[in-house]
Amino acid sequence: MTAVGAREVYQLFRDVALQQKTLRPDVGPHWRDVDTGSVWVRIDQHRIALFKDAGRLHHCLRCELDDGRVAEQQAWDSPGTDPLELLSVWERTQLLRALAG
């Protein structure tokens, strides 16, 4: 099974920004209820854990794709390789709106 690349996860976030896919809360606390900690979301059947630090979207902790592939934060440990870092300012703003919604 091939690894989950940062670009593959970025594309999910981008599709949410472009309103081509829907982001919804998964198990656990909702985005608005967490100041610092992890929040699970779903994009289609993919599960993604995001880390929020002092109220701000910080990094991607884990991604579980619907085909069974999984990537942990360590997969994107090098600078500039976290899927969230690949988002443009506009895409990130749209993602944050979807998280808050």
Predicted features by range, described:
Residues 1-44, 70-89:
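Negatively charged, low-complexity tracts enriched in Asp/Glu with abundant Ser/Thr
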Residues 18, 55, 97-101:
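Short, intrinsically disordered, mixed-charge
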Residues 48-82:
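Intrinsically disordered, low-complexity regulatory segments enriched in Ser/Thr/Pro
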Residues 85-100:
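Helix-rich interaction surfaces within compact, conserved domain-sized segments
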